[in-house]
Amino acid sequence: ARARRHGLTTGEGATAEGTAAEGAVPAAFRPMLAALTERANDASTAVVDMDPKGDGTTVSMTLTWAELNQQVNAAATRLHALGVRPGDRVNLMVPPGARLTTLIYACMKLGAVIVVADTGLGIPGLTRALKGANPSFLVGIPAALSAARTLLWPGVRISVEPLGSVQEKLLGVAGSVFTAPAADGTPGAPVPTPTVVEFPSPVPDADAAVLYTSGSTGPAKGVVYTQRQLAGMRDAIANTYGFAPGSGLVAGFAPFALLGPALGATSVTPTMDVTRPKTLTASALASAAAAIDASVVFASPAALVNVVATADELNAEQRAALAKVQTVLSAGAPIPVPLLEALSALVPNASLHTPYGMTEGLPVTDVSFEMIRQAIAEGTPNAAGEVLDPFARDGVCVGFAVYGAAVAIAPLLQDGSVADELTHEPGVTGEILVSAPHVKDRYDTLWVTEEQSISTPGWHHTGDVGHLDASGRLWVEGRLAHVLLTSQGVLTPVAAEQSAESLPEVRRAALVAVGPAGTAAPVLVIEASANTAALEARQSASGLKRALLDRVPGARRFPIAEGVAPFELSQLVRQKVAEDTGVELAAVLVVHEHPTDIRHNSKIDRPALGEWASKVLAGA
């Protein structure tokens, strides 16, 4: 069910229990706090904050490992004095940085359960999430405390820093964790507490965190992790990417910064609006890298797009800092090869990786840019017209399962449902199932969703669709919810989208269905980036000039109206998609910008586009 007509098979594979066991890596439980405890007397840098009010080029706060350990213990003692006990849920509404890192590890020290529902969910989504999680405490900045009072968010309210007595009374605040900043702006320390607290030993299978999905495929879901599963995530990342004490991590995706202390890595979050990843600039990223002599960078695809777009602002020192980076990780949405190529020029000595995973388990697979190139070459006819691997195509290559993980396919059936049995047969499209020590414990208070996700014992149903190639690499073809049941058969969206995106006139594309399931028409909605004069340039050119324009992704562009695409553009896209995938498009529509999720700014809201496309084609 790649994005062309498919002969679908159910396939025969190993049993769920047998295959899941293959990926498991038994290991002794190492608590998330282990590295912090071991480095309690280490005077080297643990956490760095960049100035959030400036241009992202200056450091505002630095904590050594010894200082971080002291602050975590002091903050845990203060939270205990304010009533936090083992098992209590604590909602942390604090911007990424040293403060949030300290609070997270303080909660772990107490055996409390952190609730992380980011503001990227929007106010309605955030309210729904928090009322579902029902935390006992809410630790936040004034804006969060004010929202909590107005929107009746649950939990005893605790301020990060002291508020005036009037404001404390107005917001119903029980106290603060940290003292006020000093006159010179130096951040305050945890409020001194005379009580001596005996911290509990970590319980491996006790709840540790409730994290929330992005809400890009429906209401955000709370995902519960135990101490053991968080440690498994840390171990998967450490073993896959070679993290070691002394590694420097620039986290353009905030959750990864929080893993820094557990990995034994020095971490920094670059200056950016965390709810809008595409606000990350090359200068801010490079300055953050320079601040910790970074070896690893993690950023979302949308963030990297803007980093590449603003690269001309870099000075020699910033370019030198990026040249020291050894690994770049990016996940959350497919990353086009041209973006990876442009990024390579900024980090010339780095290996680029695009891991696949989800809130329920990250990472699941990993692939390097070199492996992507190799896979594409194997799926492309050579000079003799031979194809080494006919299944190395029609999707996004995300590589092989990471340390401790296993992947299998539940074949897609003609009605869009999936088969019960699993397979590893190359070329069979179906739902992607994963098994790993770091996959979630359960969905929070979503019992039906949880039962569906674990309906195959030992496996998590991801809701993504894809296939394996002859080498065992995984190729993602889209979301199960976005599979199209058309008159041409069952189609998955990614291959047709990739085909259209290979044209210089198309920045981004989304395949949607218009009409009843089973007889729906495939419609491609393209984003005409700074929209497409490349087409008009091609029409007016000839010979060598026309051939050159065909090769230039940035050929002159200017806006065109949203709605049905101009005839010439439509024909160009239809022909390309038909040649590459066999899919006959019913229509090509144009939008200035696709609707995307807030967290990554990358995941396209295809249901919304489908509704819009139906109205446009109906003349509404």
PLM region descriptions:
Residues 112-113, 231-248, 254-296, 310:
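Conserved AMP-binding/adenylation subdomain of ANL enzymes
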Residues 43-45, 180-212, 219, 243-247:
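Conserved pre-ATP/AMP-binding loop-to-beta segment of ANL
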